[in-house]
């Protein structure tokens, strides 16, 4: 996921990165 994001946004980015 992206660094420097809020927890909720960080998790959302992690899911997008994994996909």
From Swiss-Prot:
* Alphabetized UniProt keyword annotations: Calcium channel impairing toxin, Ion channel impairing toxin, Neurotoxin, Secreted, Toxin, Voltage-gated calcium channel impairing toxin
Cellular component annotations (GO), alphabetically ordered: extracellular region
Q: Which tissues and organs express this gene's product?
A: Expressed by the venom gland.
Subcellular location(s): the record lists: Secreted
- The source's superkingdom equals Eukaryota
Q: Which GO terms describe its molecular function?
A: calcium channel regulator activity; toxin activity
Question: What does the UniProt function comment say about this protein?
Answer: Antagonist of L-type calcium channels (Cav1/CACNA1).
Q: Under which name does UniProt file this protein?
A: U7-ctenitoxin-Pn1b
């Amino acid at each position: 996921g992206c660094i420097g994001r809020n927890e909720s946004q960080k998790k959302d980015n992690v899911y997008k990165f994994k996909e």
